Design a protein with these regions (language model features):
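Short, conserved phosphate/pyrophosphate- and ester-handling motifs at nucleotide-, phospho-/glycolipid
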Residues: 47, 183, 251
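Short beta-strands and strand-loop turn motifs
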Residues: 102-104, 128-135, 163, 181-186
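Conserved phosphate-binding/catalytic region of the ribokinase-like
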Residues: 170, 198-306
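Conserved N-terminal subdomain of the carbohydrate kinase-like
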Residues: 23-25, 49-129, 296-301
């Protein structure tokens, strides 16, 4: 089973304006949405779109927590949240105007007893399970929580995926996470230098592998993504051009796609595919299967796989190639016509 953990889930209240936000004035929206999320929940949502079962873990509180839990159940997500006695699940306000402005809630305080309940749930995980830890740690929790959880699971064979930043990510590397997914700027922070170009990004990813990471998947916004796998391979995919409607959840979708394609040939997911969303066709940023871009990567079992380009599907038919890198050589581009469904 795949388990995702969202320590501080949220209800995102997304407000759209048709002009710039005027601070200190009354601004009238032209549209609004409520999106239930948090990074781990976003991952579970994309996994569901790919036909993969998962269980979303985390903490909820108050009426907003109950509303979030009901909403996720209505979307078909399986949850096993820990219910807190005090506080309320946070509401984040996202203002979409000429520029994006965010006001994120603090969320409830998480007592040590609640964290212990989560640890006890994770104690039941085995080598057949995948654990995805994503996002920041609330200020009320120990900042070494990620380390504690991975140390607790160390030696059990659980494949741990970590999507976090700075010390949260750096400090779990000794526990050999199966996958980490920094973006290129976060990767630069981890190695202490600005990264320009694929060669520098690849070298930095390998530095993190030397520190313990098995697979390093680097998201690069409009420049696509780069994967350095545990077998030493380097794989590059571009990103189709288009108007960015909402970038929220793009990295979470990439994590979900890697897990669905690399680890579990389940449901309707292609057996060795990792998706990436097209922001131009994904109004809420995540959870739309037809907007997932797929590229083939090596399966854990080690069977023959040419890392061939796997066609992508976008609403507007845009297609981008897959670059196959060879040690010391130039990238090879493999193209293909887009397929439609």
């Amino acid at each position: 089973m795949i388990y995702t953990v969202t320590f501080n889930p949220a209800i995102d209240y997304v407000v759209r304006l048709d002009k710039a936000l005027e601070v200190g004035e009354v601004n009238r929206a032209v549209g609004e949405d409520c999106v239930l999320g948090g990074k781990g929940i976003n991952v579970s949502g994309v996994l569901r779109e790919l036909g993969c079962e998962s269980v979303a873990l985390g903490f909820v509180a108050g009426e907003t927590g109950a509303w979030l839990e009901r909403g996720l159940a209505a979307q078909g997500l399986c949850t096993d949240f820990i219910h807190l006695d005090h506080g309320m699940t946070r509401i984040n306000v996202k203002i979409k105007a000429s520029e994006e402005t965010e006001l994120n809630g603090a969320g409830p305080a998480i007592p040590a007893s609640a964290l212990q309940q989560l640890e006890e749930k994770l104690d039941a995980l085995t080598e057949n399970d995948v654990l995805i830890l994503a996002g920041s740690i609330p200020s009320s929790m120990p900042q070494d929580t990620y380390e504690r959880l991975l140390a607790r699971l160390d030696g059990k064979g659980v494949r741990c995926v970590v999507d976090a930043t700075r010390a949260l990510l750096a400090n779990v590397l000794p526990f050999h996470p199966f996958l980490i997914k920094p973006n290129n700027h976060e990767l630069g922070e981890l190695v202490g230098r600005e990264l320009t170009g694929d060669a520098e990004i690849t070298a930095a990813a390998r530095t993190l592998q030397e520190k313990g990471a098995r697979n390093v998947l680097v998201s690069m916004a409009g420049d696509g993504a780069l994967l350095v796998d545990e077998a030493g391979g380097v794989h590059r995919i571009g990103c189709p051009k288009g108007k960015v409607v909402n970038s929220v959840g793009a990295g979470d979708s990439m994590v979900a796609g890697f897990v669905a394609g690399y680890l579990t040939p389940c449901g309707s997911a292609p057996p060795a595919a990792a998706p990436r969303p097209s922001a131009s066709g994904l109004p809420n940023g995540v959870r739309s299967k037809r907007c997932l871009q797929r590229f083939k990567i090596r399966r854990k079992q080690g069977e023959e796989n040419p890392y061939a380009y796997h066609h992508i599907i976008f609403p507007q038919g845009h297609c981008t190639g897959f670059h196959r890198f060879h040690a010391g050589g130039d990238p090879e581009r493999a193209g293909g016509a887009a397929s439609h469904s």
